[in-house]
């Protein structure tokens, strides 16, 4: 959050000599700052006195995180040091519901020897969005701009959700990276009429782009709203085309896409390991978001390897993290492959103001 009586302005726009791509977009806020230097001879960005005035012009802001309040959905969960110390946090958890059909792990051909999974530690995540940028660069995601994002046509596979907990002056900001959960009981797979999205033997919710006919049923049935539809054939004008990842299939108009757990990296590592006559070892495969995270909040690996770091953090018998483990929207029984670890606070945040429904969504997710 922003301190009361303080103004925060993003920088980096309003370029005049950046070519066809970035020239003329936005406003250069540097022109608003006085020409003051600190003791080191650098421009002073903080501590500048400013005044806000109403003008007869309108503008709008765009974000991709939706509602700023959780409304009791426990998406960005938190606990306290006291609860963890006394073991109170674990008392409120429940066992998974019993299943009528056998789990895929009991089916021949599934999850042997790999089942890919991820853990995200919300106590480490500071919302810097480096993971989002890394995903764009790794997977050739197009930047659609402000206008298309405003109508729900953003193409980011990973978004940083921000939630405000508390009321009055007693509040905190929580960040939750949200991406495809690679569900073991995914709602998207059952509604695709052409089998373009399916559950592969390694636990990935895979995509076959050539099969997709763009019904968008999968997006409608995704509770996490992480699927993206190509409304256009997005172009990368020169020289931006030279920065594209050649190991990634280029998607065309009318095709749905989403996070793949960087399957291209998995396949490359498996190929190298196969040449050496062995299975992959823990840590050999890193997703782009994991590799870029400066706080190491993301852990990725093979859940079938009990000695892997991700398995130790995600398994229910993990003594260190079991009181912090949870799955987003677990009540839907989608069996996501991503386990979140609760943020740890030093005190309880009072958030029982049920009458406050938060901000309305500034945009609709496509």
Features from the language model and the residues they span:
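Iron-sulfur (Fe-S) cluster-binding segments and ferredoxin-like electron-carrier domains
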Residues: 134-145, 231, 297-309
């Amino acid at each position: 959050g922003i301190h009361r009586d303080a103004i925060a302005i993003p920088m980096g726009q309003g370029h005049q000599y950046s070519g066809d791509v970035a020239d003329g977009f936005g406003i250069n806020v540097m022109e608003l700052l006085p020409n003051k230097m600190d003791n080191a001879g650098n421009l002073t960005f903080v501590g500048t006195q400013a005044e806000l005035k109403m003008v007869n012009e309108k503008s709008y802001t765009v974000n991709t995180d939706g509602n700023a309040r959780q409304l009791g959905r426990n998406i960005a969960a938190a606990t306290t040091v006291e609860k963890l110390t006394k073991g109170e946090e674990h008392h409120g958890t429940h066992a998974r519901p019993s299943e009528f059909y056998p789990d895929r792990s009991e089916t021949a051909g599934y999850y042997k020897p790999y089942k890919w999974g991820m853990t995200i530690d919300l106590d480490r995540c500071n919302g810097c969005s480096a993971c989002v940028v890394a995903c764009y660069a790794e997977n050739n995601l197009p930047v659609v701009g402000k206008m298309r994002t405003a109508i729900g046509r953003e193409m980011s596979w990973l978004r940083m959700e921000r939630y405000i907990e508390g009321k009055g002056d007693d509040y905190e900001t929580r960040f939750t990276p949200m991406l495809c959960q690679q569900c073991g009981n995914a709602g998207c797979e059952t509604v695709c009429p052409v089998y373009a999205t399916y559950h592969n033997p390694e636990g990935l919710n895979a995509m076959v782009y050539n099969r997709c006919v763009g019904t968008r049923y999968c997006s409608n049935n995704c509770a996490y709203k992480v699927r993206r539809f190509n409304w256009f054939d997005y172009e990368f004008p020169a020289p931006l085309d030279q920065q594209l990842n050649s190991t990634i299939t280029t998607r065309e108009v009318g095709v749905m896409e989403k996070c793949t757990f960087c399957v291209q990296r998995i396949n490359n590592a498996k190929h190298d390991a196969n040449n050496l006559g062995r299975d992959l070892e823990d840590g050999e495969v890193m997703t782009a978001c994991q590799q870029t995270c400066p706080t190491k909040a993301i852990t990725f690996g093979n859940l079938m390897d009990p000695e892997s770091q991700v398995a130790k953090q995600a398994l229910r018998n993990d003594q260190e993290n079991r009181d912090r483990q949870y799955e987003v929207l677990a009540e839907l029984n989608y069996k996501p492959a991503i386990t979140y670890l609760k943020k740890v606070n030093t005190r309880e945040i009072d958030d029982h103001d049920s009458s406050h429904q938060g901000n309305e969504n500034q945009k609709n997710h496509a």
